[in-house]
A protein has these predicted regions:
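Short, small/acidic-rich helices and loops at N termini and domain boundaries
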Residues: 1-89
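Glycine-biased, small-residue-rich flexible motifs in mid-sequence functional cores and linkers
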Residues: 1-19, 86-302
Length: 302
């Protein structure tokens, strides 16, 4: 057990209400200029909890007026989801490999699914018909091997993989990881699918309720690269079906390399002359061109 975990375990034995940690996290995150990386560095990576950091910084800003307003807003959300505090009982072991682990994780469904054998199937939102077909077929084969599918529930490849689970007659399992608060829907046309994922298996988010509410719309896009990093941490391997040179999927590919998680690039994508990004990954440790799902199954069973 790491020194960081020993510190966190000691803190958890001597304090805290998870609810107070949630409020502290939400409030700290709502401050101007705050980010997941900054909060992760100041809390999880130093072995302290959000409430301790809030006490340290209390003299830097007032915590009465807007703290109460924030608390009322958070309270209105809590009946719709559950949450777990990093370092507390129930935090998924697999997520400790993340480069910037969130202090709090929001979820709907069975959090224990994170510890199952999981594979992300990711790719373009505006996917080709062939890409959609490949995503669906890959998911179907993984379901047949008792592997949980991880998806970002975006349009295109993500949706094709999710629908393979929905059409599996109850045999498949799915984890949806979203880049909005746990009770928001993006894209809106996937609302029914997202609710189905949450009710049947597991939906995850690390996006704070209050900051999301008050921040400018244009800054909300930053949550999606962080979502992809969380997907990499949740997954034992990632399969890229197709993606452009500017795709957000590349954030997940880079995270796989950092965490030592296997990354598979479908051959149709790797040999696509219209994109150059695969050449930056192919040949690096843990990266394979995917010809058959058996390669993925071998990698995650090793």
């Amino acid at each position: 057990m790491s020194a960081q975990q020993l510190i966190l375990d000691d803190i958890m034995r001597t304090t805290v209400s998870p609810y107070e940690e949630l409020l502290a996290y939400e409030y700290l995150y709502s401050r101007k200029g705050e980010s997941l990386k900054k909060l992760s560095d100041a809390t999880v990576k130093k072995g302290i909890l959000p409430s301790y950091l809030l006490k340290e910084r209390a003299g830097l800003f007032g915590v009465e007026g807007d703290y109460g307003k924030m608390t009322a807003y958070i309270d209105s959300k809590l009946g719709k989801c559950s949450f777990v505090v990093n370092g507390a009982y129930g935090w998924p072991e697999k997520l400790k490999d993340s480069a910037r682990p969130a202090p709090v994780l929001y979820y709907r469904g069975d959090l224990g699914l994170v510890e199952s054998k999981n594979v992300s199937i990711v790719g373009a939102r505006e996917a080709s018909d062939a890409g959609m077909s490949r995503a669906h077929a890959a998911a179907k084969k993984l379901i047949g091997a008792d592997v949980t599918i991880v998806t970002g529930l975006a349009k295109g490849v993500d949706t094709a993989a999710a629908k393979a689970v929905a059409q599996s007659n109850g045999k498949g399992r799915i984890i949806g990881v979203i880049g909005t608060p746990i009770d928001e829907y993006y894209p809106r046309e996937n609302r029914q699918l997202q609710d189905w994922v949450a009710e049947r298996n597991l939906l995850l988010s690390q996006v704070p309720f209050y900051k999301y509410k008050i921040q400018p719309f244009t800054s909300k896009r930053n949550y999606f690269p962080e979502r992809n990093e969380l997907m990499a941490a949740v997954s034992d391997a990632t399969v890229v079906v197709e993606a452009s040179d500017r795709s957000g999927v590349l954030h997940q590919a880079k995270a796989c390399l950092r965490m030592g998680r296997p990354l598979f690039i479908m051959r149709s994508c790797a040999e696509n002359p219209a994109v150059s990004w695969p050449s930056r990954f192919i040949g690096k440790p843990g990266v394979q061109i995917l010809d058959d799902i058996s390669q993925v199954l071998e990698a995650i069973s090793a």
